[in-house]
A protein has these predicted regions:
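Alpha-helical scaffolds flanking conserved acidic
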Residues: 33-37, 96-105
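Short, surface-exposed loop and linker segments with low hydrophobicity and enrichment for Pro/Ser/Thr
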Residues: 46-48, 99
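Long, amphipathic alpha-helical surface segments
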Residues: 1-5, 9-46, 59-62, 66-92, ...
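Early exported N-terminus immediately downstream of N-terminal targeting peptides
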Residues: 51-59
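N-terminal hydrophobic or amphipathic segments with adjacent small-residue motifs
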Residues: 50-52, 105, 150
Length: 178
């Protein structure tokens, strides 16, 4: 009887740890998503009618979408559109797991097709996550290196790239809190 109680107790403890780890992972993902939104807003800023077909924080108006080309979106509408676009991008890259966020952010700026054909995706498909230099090299505008875009890439990478150390630290934090 005592052995059964210990086994049940151990099972509950393991389940509680797994549940805590899932909650920690979800909280980390939510917080990284908020960081991604913050970075995009910082560098895209709000687009005005003269920037057509870009609206809000860089959403490209697609055929069939109803936007008034003479009106600037409200902050809340632009924010909702940015979040929706970023989530769509991340879903496209979900096969890359923890790298779906950073790929989605890059696609938000340079386009989905460009990211899909990139050397970054090629390296990740080969299992090579040493992509910092390549990621930052996506800093050109009209063929020339652009300092502001380079700064953006560095900030995106430094704040959004999830390292193995980061994952280990998150797991240790969960264990310490139990």
């Amino acid at each position: 009887m005592m052995i059964a109680a210990v086994a049940v107790s151990t099972g509950f403890a393991a389940e509680a740890v797994a549940s805590a780890e899932r909650r920690q992972e979800e909280a980390r993902a939510d917080s990284l998503f908020e960081v991604a939104v913050e970075i995009i807003k910082k560098y895209e800023t709000m687009h005005h009618p003269r920037h057509w077909p870009l609206v809000g924080y860089g959403h490209k108006v697609l055929s069939g979408e109803k936007f008034d080309r003479k009106t600037t979106l409200t902050e809340s509408r632009a924010d909702a559109l940015l979040r929706s676009d970023l989530r769509k991008n991340m879903r496209v890259f979900r096969q890359f797991g923890r790298d779906s966020m950073i790929l989605g952010v890059l696609a938000y700026n340079i386009g989905m097709g460009n990211v899909m054909r990139s050397s970054i995706v090629k390296k990740l498909r080969e299992g090579d996550r040493d992509i910092r230099d390549i990621y930052i090299s996506y800093n050109r505008y009209r063929g020339k290196t652009h300092k502001q875009i380079k700064r953006r890439r560095i900030e995106e990478f430094d704040r959004l790239f999830i390292t193995d150390t980061h994952i280990a630290n998150t797991a240790n934090t969960v264990k310490e809190n139990d």
